[in-house]
Amino acid sequence: MSTPGAQQVLFRTGIAAVNSTNHLRVYFQDVYGSIRESLYEGSWANGTEKNVIGNAKLGSPVAATSKELKHIRVYTLTEGNTLQEFAYDSGTGWYNGGLGGAKFQVAPYSRIAAVFLAGTDALQLRIYAQKPDNTIQEYMWNGDGWKEGTNLGGALPGTGIGATSFRYTDYNGPSIRIWFQTDLKLVQRAYDPHKGWYPDLVTIFDRAPPRTAIAATSFGAGNSSIYMRIYFVNSDNTIWQVCWDHGKGYHDKGTITPVIQGSEVAIISWGSFANNGPDLRLYFQNGTYISAVSEWVWNRAHGSQLGRSALPPA
């Protein structure tokens, strides 16, 4: 059965999430094309037609990144398949960001990933999307306008894109990791400040369904060490997790939780193994009330379990 609230959520909606520790924000699209915000501040709230931050092409991807919750950026596509940005700054509230004015044209089936560069107080953004020629393009904000960055080469048309940024404690600048599909492989490209973009593609999974959702997070950055978790929807209609752990590389791959076919996925994390963490939160659609967004939780105390079965407005 459904609920009136769940019926407002687009089936296979794009999903994005940001956080400052356990203060959570989740973004999704409603059936009218509006992008809504649900929030967790001790309990779940919002997600109604009063919590719309902007409008996008129906079926648009939704990506988000934040500096804590003081600065939030949400990315979607316009009807004309150009990138657009909804921005929140504490003290200002929501407004239309500058990216839309750049009129960056992307493929109509492009997905989006977004990161604030880690380890700096400056608001530096990197957006990843697929151009009409099916290459993955980086778009950069360094405070002086939006510009095209590095082109990361060809990818499967309509590939999911996951990205994360972190800062090794012994490196002078942020690192970036991005994941997408070439043919059916899931691959990683890497950027480190002393090397730039490494030319090689690292395969993390040999065969995944075409256009599967991809989401990624990182935590526990240390001296040339990082922990990363990458998620995608496999052909068994469950979310799979691929782990990168310091000293082990990519090692642990396995199923997490069932989803609807074609579900999108968002992941957030906080804390680290060194400090009795991390905490992981995964957002997806698994058929609860047909189209509600659901939550999966991992923490050290309880391990893997389902969290909130249906986020507001469901």
Swiss-Prot record:
Zn(2+) binds at C243, D245, H251. Keywords: Lectin, Metal-binding, Repeat, Zinc. Pfam families: Fungal_lectin. Residues 2-314 are annotated as: 6 X approximate tandem repeats. Alpha-L-fucose 1 binds at R25, E37, W94. SUPFAM superfamilies: Fucose-specific lectin. The keyword Metal-binding applies. GO terms for molecular function: carbohydrate binding; metal ion binding. Lectins have particular value as specific probes for investigating the distribution, structure and biological function of carbohydrate chains on the cell surface of animal, plant, and microorganism because of their specificity for defined carbohydrate structures. AFL is suitable for detecting core fucose on cell surface glycoproteins. Alpha-L-fucose 2 binds at R73, E85, G98, W146. Alpha-L-fucose 3 binds at R126, E138, T150, W197. Alpha-L-fucose 5 binds at R229, Q241. It comes from the Eukaryota. Sequence repeats lie at residues 2-53, 54-103, 104-155, 156-206, 207-259, 260-314. Alpha-L-fucose 4 binds at R177, Q188. Alpha-L-fucose 6 binds at W44, R281, E295. Belongs to the fungal fucose-specific lectin family. Multispecific lectin that is able to recognize L-fucose in all possible linkages. These could be found not only in decomposed plant matter in soil, which is the natural environment for A.fumigatus, but also in various epitopes on human tissues. Mediates binding of A.fumigatus conidia to airway mucin in a fucose dependent manner. AFL adopts the six-bladed beta-propeller fold and contains six binding sites per monomer, each located between two adjacent blades. The six binding sites that are non-equivalent, and owing to minor differences in amino-acid composition they exhibit a marked difference in specific ligand recognition. Homodimer. This is Fucose-specific lectin. It comes from Aspergillus fumigatus.
